[in-house]
Amino acid sequence: MSDVKKMFINGQWVEALSGETRESINPANGEVLAAVAEGSAADVDKAVEAAKEAFYNGPWGSTPAQERAALLFKLADLVDANAGELAELEMRDNGKPLRETKYDVADTAACFRYYAGLCTKPMGQTYEVADPMQAMTVREPIGVVGLIVPWNYPLLMATWKIAPALAAGNCIIFKPAELTPLSAVRLFELIEAAGFPKGSANLVMGAGASVGARMAEHPEIEKIAFTGGTETGRKIMMAATGNLKKISLELGGKSPCVVFEDADMDAAVDWALFAIFANQGQVCSAGSRLLLQESIHDEFVEKLVARAKQIKVAPGDAEGVEMAAMISEAHMEKVLKYIEIGKEEGATLLCGGERLTDGELGKGFFVAPTIFTDTTPDMRIVQEEIFGPVLAVQKFTDDEDAVRLANDSIYGLAGGVFSENGTRAMKFIKKLRAGITWINCYHPTYSEAPWGGYKQSGIGRDLGTYGFDEYTEVKQININLEPGPVGWFEG
């Protein structure tokens, strides 16, 4: 085991004030990868003081947009230069296949470049108002912002928040997930190497119950951005009321993947597998509910199950691996419990449903691709987010029935539809209560387009210009072009 991985506060690598550490584990084999500093509320307070100084009195608050852009472009170049190392690190810390982490790293660099380019684009507006006045708006950074991300896409989710926050001119306190801190440590080493001023970017590691809670309630953190579970999002929302801080929340999902009878069946089968089993189903937008028109249900399920049984489950660096380890033993047990719940509720288990322990898989936390049919809308496996490789298949009769079933959820993050009839597909999408939608595909995501959901899937948006705006305040400026007395009072 290497030396303790430290936190980054005010341009310095520091241990936790308490001296506590936590081990980071490779979920594929249980190997201890590193010990990392385990911060607390006191470390958050220290980071906030550094961020305040950098924003209000230091160089970052007055750094021109062109210089912010140059630093972000340099950071993107450093990510590219260290892509192999970052992908390997992410694979070992998170457990996902190496080919997935390579995509994540490439997307990370692209996201930094997108927001670097956005820094210098027009942000304000002017308004035609009555003479002799001129009215305009400008966008300004919020100030000190807190960023909290989950463990399923540690590096990429970090970038989705860090890039726009810094591009807009804010100072950040960033908290990675407790289970996957290592790529964040490496990213902050690259932030330091790129030359960002001290205090502009701060890394505090630790538990959500201590570090995350303090960030949410801290009176001098002016915005909190969080990606994670809906219950945690509720707690953050309540804690943020103390100083009425701005919040953006990207939360849970139970997203539908809908296939009409006129779809290209083989293509839809392929996408449906990708929708639920990519990243072991540990995706907030996973297509965990598969809605099939009843006329194609049996044939589609037969093809789907046959393909699912062929998925190669192995450690992330194995040759030809298609699905890898779950993030932790505790999460694996949660997923396995949901599988048992599905059986008890009366759903039919067609494949998977078990922990895989053959050979080297016995050292890690692996679950077979799992498919249930004969489900009903009231079942927990249909309504609750499992966050694993578990698919619930439902039948629908016609377009109206498909819309009804698809929207029968407290969540509204994402959804996809498959049909060769473009009018039918578009009509369905317009009625789907979800923030991210796809037609004849599932999961494509772009830095340029907003990401976020309806209902209990969150508030606000990541990515695109919408994601940038989340980290800004709008200031109205009014100019009198003919200065003189107002003439309101006669005396």
Where are these predicted regions, by residue range?
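Hydrophobic face of amphipathic alpha-helices that form TPR/SEL1-like repeat modules
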Residues: M1-A28, A54
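Structural signal for hydrophobic packing residues in well-ordered secondary-structure cores
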Residues: F55, P59, A76-A83, A87, ...
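A short hydrophobic/small-residue beta-strand
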Residues: C171-I173, L349, I436
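ALDH superfamily catalytic-core signature
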Residues: E231-T376, I439, V486-F489
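Rossmann-like NAD(P) dinucleotide-binding subdomain of oxidoreductase/dehydrogenase enzymes
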Residues: G124-A267, F396
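Conserved C-terminal structural/oligomerization subdomain of aldehyde/semialdehyde dehydrogenase
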Residues: N29-A35, I221, V258, K312, ...
